Amino acid sequence: MVDAVIFDWGGTLTPWKTFDPAEEWLVLARAAAPDRVEEAAAALAAAAEDAWARSRNEHRSGTFAEVCAAAELVADEAHHRAYRDHLEFATWTDPDVEPMLTTLREAGIRVGLLSNTLWPREWHEEWLARDGVLDLFDGAVYTSEIPWTKPHPEAFAAAMDAVGVADPARCVFVGDRLFDDIYGAQNAGMRAVHIPHSAVPESQFGHTDGEPDAVVQHLAEIPDVIQPWR
């Protein structure tokens, strides 16, 4: 039986995009610290790398605000907007998502989202609303709001709570990363489906690659893939 399908966000619901993280922080530094751009950008990049290393190695979360604070950068909404505008190309929802989620919901399956992210919920919800899919989720967890990141079992438990499901054996997780998503979900007791299109840098690999229960090339395949498990 499948009560819920929970999705990763970046590289799963949004197609993978490769971008230069150094440029990401230069954009913010130019907006918020024009008198010390190079210094601020380097400090932001170092703080972000520390946050992601903590996520990979200790499965503890961080936030965009903490990155800015560690870099001694004061950024307001206008500065945030410049940063977000730079990254907008990587936030667009795959066109398969809306019909696929609708099919799952019509079958009585609850739909959730669990994203390892430094960014606040409001940013993610703005992007999902822009693409007309925000209201299709029964619950969403962004690790910027909880202590843990994938692959920690508590992150998956939080996602189950968000969609109102108690038994991990009745949940399926869909993601693009073999460590965070596939290993993590299976370690938490879920089935896991892999979307194998992301060019995840080797520096972001974890200690274990999960063996997915299924692999799909397109999100539109998800309803058919989980049908035998129902």
Name what the model sees in each region.
Residues 1-7, 16, 38-39, 98, ...:
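Asp-based, Mg2+/Mn2+-dependent phosphohydrolase catalytic module
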Residues 2-107, 120-122:
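N-terminal helical cap/lid subdomain that shapes the substrate entry/recognition surface
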